[in-house]
């Protein structure tokens, strides 16, 4: 196993990065609505929200907030992209053990993500599964937008060859 990847295990239980603030404006919310074919007025109709929503303004889709996690991870943890790079290594999204949408993100709200390494497990040679604690903060709010336990796989050398063989590449 590549030494940098093995040494990452020493960070279990520690904060490992925070992304910069990111603006969630109406244009981004509208693009997400279009991409997901979801015209819910709670997200895309400011007039409807002013009259009928308890928030009195549009809010971001919870799935929009969730979908930003990959971007936030690259912003906060860019140094991770080099783990295993000398062996052709790369990371894969492995899903979630837990995810909660705690507080809605208001239109024109700014959010950022905080990451903690919770677990590091060598599944087999060339495959390391990491569990990250993630909290998405909303600027000026006490409750987070999202809390999650996010799983990722780091693939190097032998793991890559196994995946390549399995998928007939």
Model-derived regions: residue spans:
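A beta-strand/beta-hairpin structural motif
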Residues: 94-98
């Amino acid at each position: 196993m590549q030494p940098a990847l093995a040494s990452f295990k020493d960070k279990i239980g520690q904060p490992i990065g925070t992304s910069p603030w990111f603006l969630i404006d109406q244009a981004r919310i509208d693009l997400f609505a279009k991409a997901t074919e979801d015209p819910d007025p709670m997200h895309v109709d400011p007039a409807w929200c002013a009259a009928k929503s308890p928030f009195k303004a549009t809010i971001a889709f919870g799935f929009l907030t969730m979908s930003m996690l990959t971007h936030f991870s690259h912003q906060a943890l860019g140094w991770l992209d080099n783990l295993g790079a000398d062996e052709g290594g790369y990371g894969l999204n492995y899903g979630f053990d837990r995810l909660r949408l705690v507080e809605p993100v208001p239109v024109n709200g700014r959010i950022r993500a905080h990451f903690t390494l919770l677990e590091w497990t060598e599944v087999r040679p060339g495959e390391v599964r990491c569990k990250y604690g993630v909290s998405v903060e909303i600027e000026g709010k006490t409750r987070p937008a999202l809390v999650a336990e996010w799983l990722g796989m780091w693939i190097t050398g032998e793991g890559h060859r196994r995946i390549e063989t399995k998928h007939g590449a």
